[in-house]
From Swiss-Prot:
This is Inner kinetochore subunit cnp20. GO terms for molecular function: chromatin-protein adaptor activity; DNA binding; protein heterodimerization activity. The gene is cnp20. Component of the kinetochore, a multiprotein complex that assembles on centromeric DNA and attaches chromosomes to spindle microtubules, mediating chromosome segregation and sister chromatid segregation during meiosis and mitosis. Component of the inner kinetochore constitutive centromere-associated network (CCAN), which serves as a structural platform for outer kinetochore assembly. Modulates outer kinetochore KMN network activity by regulating interactions within the network. It comes from the Eukaryota. Residues 259-277 have a biased composition (Low complexity). PANTHER family: CENTROMERE PROTEIN T. Component of the inner kinetochore constitutive centromere-associated network (CCAN) (also known as central kinetochore Sim4 complex in fission yeast), which is composed of at least cnl2, cnp3, cnp20, fta1, fta2, fta3, fta4, fta6, fta7, mal2, mhf1, mhf2, mis6, mis15, mis17, sim4 and wip1. Belongs to the CENP-T/CNN1 family.
Length: 479
């Protein structure tokens, strides 16, 4: 009899629904939990796999294929594919329409085309060539001016166009009447010509201009004071009489003027030369009057003439120290009741400045004198160098034997070099702090960096230990 195994209720109600199968337990790794989304637990789909492969293939470079295409080539290909026929711009279309449509004479007179600088220059050169080729043509109908660069921008009937540097070709015409007719033909509505022989001071009024142009000499205060000043200033003033405040006329134009002629210029030159020749005699008379002392004395000028130069005086003082008497300082604190300069000084009582030879003799006497103070040596930081006695004491405290004088000299030079180096370091600290002086805090900081000062050793203890009483600074009293 075959035995049948029946599941008991206990076996059917096992804990498998709580623990889960083995395949389900594989999903629970230490980095994942039950609460992760199901999309992360799924396997990679074919679509996702293809996308990843495409991205990796783009990132990976194929070594056997030469990459000749650039982004610019791609843009060029796209533009050719999109726009097969070139589309004209609106500016080009308008210019092409203007070229094809014929213009009448009235339209040409109304619109004056703006020329570029190159075209204007070519027009200028063509005008010069025409004038040189046809000298015998009628000059009454010819245009005497040359077209300037700014001709299309303003009205051509302006007087300033005729007095540009290129427009001075009018000076070739000597006759003033012919030049007047030509100017009236070229400039409409001109009441008085610029080169008429009526008057040198006249008003040129143009109908189209808002501001009239005055043809006048210099201002009143400059013309009235022509006799004053130096001969050069008077000569410049006479020349400036024939210059307008707006433009300057050349001498070739002014030759036609009755007020400006060769005789007048010659007379002016002769008067100028006579005035220049009178200058030495005037100077001699001034010197004679100065000697006679007829002028009022100027104390500042006399003091400037008779005083030493400040720089030379400082150099002499730095070289030697003069011996002073005690009698000079007796009346130093008394008040000065009388003025410094009462009256002009006489020639006999004037200060006599010694010569260089006298100064050299005085300096040599002072150098040879036995009463000469010993010079003190100073370091770069403007403090006294340690004296040799202090260096000798320090050296004897460290050594048990006697020290020779040559060793002391070497020690002094070494101490000087040490102080120079420290002065450079301290000046760097002061510059960093934007100060011009070296303070005690800079020294303390430097000694801290050199491990000379610590919490156990202070600066005052080092001063008491190494510095003598003559060098050590006085103790600060605490209040």
């Amino acid at each position: 009899m075959a035995s049948h195994n029946y599941e008991t209720p206990l076996k059917s109600s096992s804990f498998q629904h709580l623990v889960g199968t083995l395949s389900q337990r594989r999903h629970f790794t230490p980095s994942r939990s039950r609460y992760t989304p199901r999309s992360a637990q799924r396997t990679v789909t074919p679509h996702k796999r293809r996308a990843l492969a495409r991205r990796n293939s783009l990132a990976r470079r194929r070594s056997n294929v030469f990459s000749a295409t650039t982004p610019r080539d791609i843009l060029r290909m796209l533009s050719r594919a999109l726009a097969k026929n070139p589309v004209p711009s609106p500016a080009e279309s308008e210019s092409s329409e203007r070229r094809h449509t014929p213009q009448t004479n009235s339209q040409k007179s109304q619109k004056t085309p703006r020329l570029s600088s190159n075209k204007r220059r070519t027009l200028k050169n063509d005008a010069k060539q025409r004038n040189s080729q046809s000298p015998g043509t009628d000059t009454s109908d010819a245009n005497l001016t040359i077209q300037s660069i700014e001709a299309p921008r303003r009205a051509p009937q302006r007087l300033s166009d005729f007095f540009t540097p290129d427009g001075r070709r009018v000076s070739n015409i000597r006759d003033s009447l012919i030049s007047e007719k030509r100017l009236e033909n070229n400039i409409d509505q001109v009441q008085e010509s610029a080169l008429s022989t009526a008057s040198s001071n006249r008003l040129i009024d143009l109908k189209n201009d808002e501001v009239p142009i005055f043809r006048i000499p210099l201002s009143d205060y400059e013309t009235d004071d022509m006799d004053d000043g130096t001969p050069l200033q008077r000569h410049v003033a006479t020349l400036n009489q024939y210059q307008s405040p707006i433009f300057n006329l050349g001498p070739d134009i002014l030759e036609d003027e009755p007020s400006y002629s060769s005789r007048a210029s010659r007379s002016r030159q002769s008067s100028l030369s006579s005035r220049l020749s009178e200058l030495p005699s005037k100077r001699a008379s001034l010197e004679i009057l100065r000697r006679e002392n007829t002028f009022p004395a100027d104390p500042i000028q006399e003091f400037g003439e008779k005083a030493y130069n400040e720089r030379e005086l400082m150099e002499e003082i730095s070289n030697f120290e003069p011996l002073l008497d005690d009698n000079l300082l007796e009346n130093a604190n008394e008040a000065v009741n009388s003025p410094v300069v009462d009256a002009p000084m006489d020639a006999d009582s004037a200060l006599e400045i010694p010569n260089d030879e006298d100064n050299g003799e005085i300096l040599n006497k002072l150098k040879d004198s036995p009463f000469k103070k010993p010079k003190r040596r100073y370091s770069k930081s403007s403090t006294l160098v340690l004296p040799e006695t202090n260096i000798r004491k320090l050296a004897n405290s460290y050594s048990q034997k006697k020290i020779a004088g040559s060793v002391i000299e070497e020690l002094t030079t070494a101490s000087e070099l040490f102080f120079k180096q420290i002065a450079n370091d301290l000046s760097a600290f002061a510059d960093h702090a934007h100060r011009k002086t070296i303070d005690t805090q800079d020294v303390v900081l430097l000694m801290k960096r050199q491990r000379k000062i610590s919490e156990k050793k202070s600066l005052s203890s080092l001063m008491q230990q190494y510095l003598s009483r003559e060098i050590a600074p006085p103790a600060i009293k605490r209040t």
